Curated annotation (Swiss-Prot):
Its main location: nucleus. One of its GO terms (molecular function) is GTPase activity. The gene is EST3. It is found in: Nucleus; Chromosome, Telomere. This is Telomere replication protein EST3. GO terms for cellular component: chromosome, telomeric region; telomerase holoenzyme complex. It holds the Pfam family TPP1. The keyword Nucleus applies. The keyword Nucleus applies. Component of the telomerase complex involved in telomere replication. Stimulates RNA/DNA heteroduplex unwinding which favors the telomere replication by the telomerase.
């Protein structure tokens, strides 16, 4: 008799630490940036990680903050020692740039490339800025041509520090939209752009 795999056990469940937070954090940041400059961003969007220790997974400041967690979906480009990727929370994806400093520290800590066997792994991040890229700049920087067909402004996380929280490579067959495709982001960006146009005539 063929072996039957129950649907509930066909795929590993996602981590309980990975929650939906990107939209709730990015949209208010866009709204606060002002009508005249919706691309201003937030320099200290996520604070630095505590000093690396063997008990990082037990650090309260890490596990109690949902904004610390992202799962790597894919890497898109390595350029000038910076590594570009797409990562996600439990609901949406976002473009991520790991700085050269971040990449160097990661590779010294784990003795491996940041791109080696880490796709679908759960990362914790810190020292992270939120940037807003123009569509053409994002498509070029991340080498994702499909970005040219979407929003005129794209949120990007520039990560200055990261660590592996769980290296189990949990792959989901669900489609996770990019943050800029979410209705709340689209609405907030439209309002910001309308305010920018009006401000030129007042």
């Amino acid at each position: 008799m063929p072996k039957v795999v129950l649907a509930s056990r066909a795929h590993k469940a996602d981590s309980i630490f990975l929650r939906e937070w990107l939209v709730d954090a990015v949209v208010p940041a866009l709204e606060r940036s002002g009508a005249c400059a919706p691309w201003a961003g937030v320099e200290c969007f996520i604070p630095a990680l505590p000093p690396a220790t063997a008990t990082l997974s037990l650090e309260p400041t890490v596990i109690q903050n949902p904004k610390r967690f992202l799962r790597i979906v894919r890497f898109t480009r390595v350029h000038d020692f910076a590594v570009c990727a797409v990562a996600r929370d439990a609901g949406c994806c976002i473009l991520v740039e790991f700085t050269p400093h971040c990449v160097s520290n990661f590779e010294r800590r784990y003795h491996q490339r940041i791109t080696s066997s880490t796709v679908n792994s759960l990362f914790v991040i810190g020292n992270t800025s939120l940037l807003f890229y123009a569509r053409s700049d994002a498509a070029a920087a991340f080498e994702v041509p499909a970005l040219m067909n979407g929003s005129s402004t794209l949120p990007v996380l520039r990560v200055g520090d990261c660590a592996i929280f769980d290296q189990d490579q949990v792959e989901s067959h669900r489609r996770f939209p990019l943050v800029q495709e979410h209705p709340r982001f689209v609405q907030s960006l439209d309002m910001a752009m309308q305010g920018s146009v009006l401000s030129r005539y007042t």
